From Swiss-Prot:
Macro domain segment(s): 74-265
Membership in a protein family: Belongs to the MacroD-type family. Zn-Macro subfamily.
PROSITE patterns per UniProt: MACRO
Protein EC: 3.2.1.-
InterPro entries: Macro_dom, Macro_dom-like
Organism of provenance: Staphylococcus aureus (strain MSSA476)
Binding site for ADP-D-ribose: D93, I94, N107, C120, I121, D122, S212, T213, G214, F216
Free-text comment on the cofactor: Binds 1 Zn(2+) ion per subunit.
Function: ADP-ribosylhydrolase that specifically reverses the SirTM-mediated mono-ADP-ribosylation at an asparatate residue of GcvH-L, by releasing ADP-ribose from the target protein. May play a role in the regulation of the response to host-induced oxidative stress.
Enzymatic class: hydrolase
Protein name in UniProt: Protein-ADP-ribose hydrolase
MF-aspect GO terms: hydrolase activity, acting on glycosyl bonds
Length: 266
């Protein structure tokens, strides 16, 4: 039973548990500040293999993450649509969205980013959702017997996030410019696969991150155009009632999405 009352105490418990699990001979020096404790916890959680955890660990982790996540929640009903009443562009932290599903830009190993404290969306979503997501993703890969293909989509629970579900998709990685037609089509396929999966699960709304524009190096302007065009076409052709949020983090992406919708309205 989870009896630790402060998130600092919970962090210390989780850090100690992961350190013992590693059979590491290094002496563990526990930081004094909450911020430093969080960074140490996050780094250990990021590199931890997809191995089972104890019920006690899960109870402590869930109590901490759910408490931290509920302190910063953005409700879809507070967002203003950019087109009609079902398409939104919103700048902020996608892990704060109270919504049916958020989209995670995954890699083909499909286990979440395993680089300690890396600031990619894959890392942040897995960190804030909890270890269960990595375990679920590992089971998906085990069952299909291969890495995840580009342009496909899989769904897991959101666990400790405000979002009910996470839809994971692997975008194309750009190694040379200009972007090939194949990679343009693969990016569009990512959006289509996520939309279809959301409708198959009778979800009401989904929020997309900017797929492939980070370390996968897809040019932001092209990616925004493809995202907007693909989503609008899907909603029109299928008569889907999905509400779709384009989540952006940078000012540049915000401007690019606004420009894409302005061109669409001309």
């Amino acid at each position: 039973m989870e009896t630790l009352k402060s998130n600092k105490a919970r962090l210390e418990y989780l850090i100690n548990d992961m350190h013992r699990e590693r059979n590491d001979n290094d002496v563990l020096v526990m930081p004094s500040s909450f911020e430093d404790l969080w960074e140490l916890y996050r780094g250990l959680a990021n590199v931890r293999p997809a191995l089972p955890v104890s019920d006690e660990y899960l109870a402590v982790q869930d109590a901490m993450l759910s408490d931290l996540n509920r302190q910063h929640v953005t409700d879809l009903k507070d967002l203003k649509p950019i087109k009609g009443d079902n398409i939104f562009v919103w700048q902020g932290d996608i892990t704060t969205l109270k919504i049916d599903a958020i989209v995670n830009a995954a890699n083909s190993r499909f286990l979440g980013c395993m680089q300690a404290n890396h600031d990619c969306i894959d890392n942040i979503i897995h960190t804030k959702a909890g270890v269960q997501v990595r375990l679920d993703c590992a089971e998906i890969i085990r069952q299909q017997g291969r890495n995840e293909g580009v342009g496909k989509a899989k769904i897991t629970r959101g666990y400790n996030l405000p979002a009910k579900y996470i839809i994971h998709t692997v975008g194309p990685q750009i190694r040379r410019l200009p972007v090939s037609k194949m990679n343009q089509d693969l990016l569009a396929k990512c959006y289509l696969s996520c939309l279809k999966l959301a409708d198959q699960h009778s979800l009401n709304h989904v929020a997309f991150c900017c797929i492939s524009t980070g370390v996968f190096a897809f040019p932001q302007d092209e990616a925004a155009e493809i995202a907007v065009r693909t989503v609008e076409s899907y909603l029109k052709e299928t008569n889907s009632t999905l509400k779709v949020v384009f989540n952006v983090f940078t000012d540049k992406d915000l401007q690019l999405y606004k420009e894409a919708f302005n061109r669409d309205a001309e």
